[in-house]
């Protein structure tokens, strides 16, 4: 080989490697055939096969979008939470992760328990206030037992009245009346509990298989009004461990969410880890969760809206203490709004509910009011995605109707749990029965992979949906060019991402003459019930600043047998196969999957709007029916025995 030939060949190879293009030696630049002693003989057509310009044959090659949802729980308490421990929880964060990963363990009441299928991720979110308090109390700490409260709680627990102690602890905490010796950030006991929380997450985090997030619950509960947030770290323990959680009790903490957001900003700067906050149980806030005029004595202004929108990208819309999507008083034309409601009062039952509070407690009304605030302030503070989670205080994320292990240890399976009171406020008489506790819910996240970073990033972009316990798959896309034939494709996600935006996304100024169209699809839980219907809920604000909503049935099961009523437009019920006495049902009604393209028939391009999907399963037995069958317990009058499990997607917003 001559020196020039070798040099030209080397240049050609380097150009191919660096540019990815076929480059020919100078002496052959005017022809298609290459005949070189070093490279061999080939021609342009052969090289084009190596460097194709056409789409790949494999439809799965080069995908850059999520292909499956990951199911998990962002809100689980263990014995490290002071109220959970007082209620009888003995399971630790490590036990919680083992259970979520699919292991069989022993419950707080000595019963074997295992999930039907492992979860994909879990956040142990023990209360930041008093972390480590219960082990300290049970050890007989002299400082705590020297106080009347500490002695009272210790004696109650030791005498088998832990539930009474737990309720008294919650009430005292809500009043800011905790005893001396109470663990606070900076103390040895507190630091030890937080570090063990981090170590447990690090030990059970298994990228690609199971994600164990580091987090905690900030529990603002002043006056019994629930303003709780779960705080989650994106990064690992080496960063999260550089700070200790923010608490609510002064002087180190605050019950004002704006102070939590300030702490989050400082924590990100100090740790190098992103953090997010997820609010929950607006239904127990007595009108304080979604303010429109003022919050904590300050006006709801642009700064409030920007800050809340930055830190609170998600809202926990369903859990054991009820579902907070909608309320019949606010949505009288929605026949599915009356679902698993807790609407008697605030968290501790100290103040009864008034109807004027409801508007500021539920997600759908927050979405509507957010549109009004955006028009006024330029920012929507309530532009959040939706998830579900458990808020279980047992260490068990067991939110399955036939495998429900309650909210607290006393509500683990027993013949008595369905007929007992969950709590009763002696002053107001407000009572919530155990049967009213919901076996709900889970968070579904469309992430690229099962890692802390990927799931966190999907949460930040709001590509999430809530379920009440089912593991159905739900897709929801919005755009301007979806066509009915798109629903016939067996790979709808490729079309959805190609033509539009997914759940949690935004649509901007409408093209002339076009209305938004939506591609929505659902696939039943593999071991669950068939699907009744998919609905799209629209909310909008008109030129007068008044808000409106409408529920559309867009596709449904048994379509050949059911048609909307010609006058009301309502779809007839799907029916029911539930045998309550035997806690059984069959998939002989409904459909295993539903998909359609729907275009807004009443679109006004000048009006701000949001759209989200609600997917309903056919009726199935509630956990109370399983208890009645297995234990032979006679339900109390009014006990709900069946339900329609459901999913709520994050909205897609339209902004003109």
Name what the model sees in each region.
Residues 26-154, 183-186, 196-208, 213-227, ...:
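C-terminal functional module detector
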